[in-house]
Structure formats: C-alpha cells, structure tokens
C-alpha cells in the first residue's frame, strides 16, 4: 500500500467500489477525487512523495460530498433488491473541468433504486460540503454508470435505460436527450 483512507467507507458499501480515482489541482492543492461506494465523493490531499518502504500513509481528507443525502445510511443491506428506495453508489470517475467537478451517482444497477444524478460540485471547500458546494444537480430516471464527457460547455452521459443526456454545464439543464436503440 502507498496510502489508505480513514473515512470508514466499508460499512456503508452497498455493493462494491466501482469508481476510478481522478487527480487534479484546485486552489494550489493537488487532490485525489474518489467516487465512493457509499455515494459520497471524497477529495483527498495527494501525497507529495512516496512514503518510506514498509510505511502506509493515511490520506488527509480535504472535503466530502454526499450525492444522495436523502438515501439510507444505516442498515444498508436491508435494501437489497429494493428498486424504489436504497442507498446510492458511484460507478463513474469524477471529472475536474474548468474549476468544477462532475460525477454521476445513484442507485446500484443490480440491487438498488432506479434513479441517478449528474452532479456539478464546487471543489474548493473543506470538510462536509454537501449543503454548501453543489452547483447543480441533473436528475435521471434510471441508473447511470458513465463517466461524464465534457466538451464545448456540454456534459454527455448515458443512463442504463439507453438514454443519452446532453447537459449545459453552466446551468445543469438538459439541452437534449436521445433514446438509443439496443437489445
């Protein structure tokens, strides 16, 4: 191990960890952004250098953001196969773009509710920024596993019902949606 966290994600993990971490610089700090298995986005301060061999460092939490504050946080496994109410998780990689962080989160594809969001977060805070740093939230009626793709002021994500969403990154409003054909 090069590093570890002390945020206690394991007991709040509804299914498993899906998200790849992302690295970016915000306000002169190099941060590691991680979409947690518990529906929280975590920003950790990156290590400045590798620790001495045999040493395991603890990453320092810069901030965290709950993508589903209304979702259950206790006894989460009792919601297994509950398609209406369940904890959320994050399957996508957070994307830092022009001073904002974008991530999709929502119910687990196999075991959870059929609801998700594309979130835009101001990544400059500290501590729990859930109530203070959400720029906007775009709801989707189905699960979402895709990492946002951002170009020319637009975010593109596809949900698990086969709908591609194009969202204006300034307003969080849909520009268009398109139902793709598939099996």
Where are these regions (language model features)?
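Noncatalytic, solvent-exposed loop/strand surfaces
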Residues: 1-183
């Amino acid at each position: 191990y090069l590093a570890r966290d002390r945020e206690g994600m394991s007991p709040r993990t509804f299914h498993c960890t899906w998200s790849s971490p992302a690295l970016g610089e915000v306000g002169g700090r190099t941060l590691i952004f991680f979409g947690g298995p518990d529906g929280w986005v975590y920003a950790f301060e990156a290590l400045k250098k590798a620790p001495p061999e045999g040493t395991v460092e603890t990453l320092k939490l810069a901030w965290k953001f709950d993508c589903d504050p209304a979702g259950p946080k206790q006894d989460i496994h009792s919601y297994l196969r509950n398609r209406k109410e369940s904890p959320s998780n994050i399957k996508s990689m957070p994307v830092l773009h022009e001073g904002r962080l974008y991530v999709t989160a929502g119910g687990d594809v196999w075991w959870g509710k059929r609801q998700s969001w594309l979130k835009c977060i101001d990544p400059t805070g500290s501590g729990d920024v859930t109530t203070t740093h959400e720029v906007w939230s775009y709801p989707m009626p189905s699960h979402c596993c895709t990492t946002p793709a951002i170009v020319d002021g637009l975010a593109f994500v596809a949900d698990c019902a086969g709908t591609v969403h194009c969202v204006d990154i300034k307003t969080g409003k849909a520009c268009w949606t398109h139902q793709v054909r598939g099996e």
